[in-house]
Amino acid sequence: MKNLFIALMLLFSSIALSQTVENDTKTVQQPQQIESKVNIKKLSENEECPFIKQVDENGNLIDCCEICCNPACFGCLN
């Protein structure tokens, strides 16, 4: 009975340890995602954008500086 109790304690402690490691991994990944959102926000606030005004597929004028300074943004071409 004593051996069974010890075996169960070891099993549950290893499960708890693996969950703790998994939770720590999730915590580490979150700041990277937040940082990328902040960078996009900074890019969208940049007033010295090299992009000229473009027209979307509906003929609406797009000021690319209002969207972002990333050339991958929709409608923004150099």
Curated annotation (Swiss-Prot):
Disulfide bonds join 64-69, 65-73, 68-76. InterPro entries: Heat-stable_enterotox_CS, Heat-stable_enterotox_STa. PROSITE patterns: ENTEROTOXIN_H_STABLE. It is found in: Secreted. The keyword Disulfide bond applies. Residues 19-61 form a propeptide. GO terms for molecular function: toxin activity. Pfam families: Enterotoxin_ST. Residues 1-18 form the signal peptide. Keywords: Disulfide bond, Enterotoxin, Secreted, Signal, Toxin, Virulence. One of its GO terms (cellular component) is extracellular space. Belongs to the heat-stable enterotoxin family. This is Heat-stable enterotoxin STO. The gene is sto.
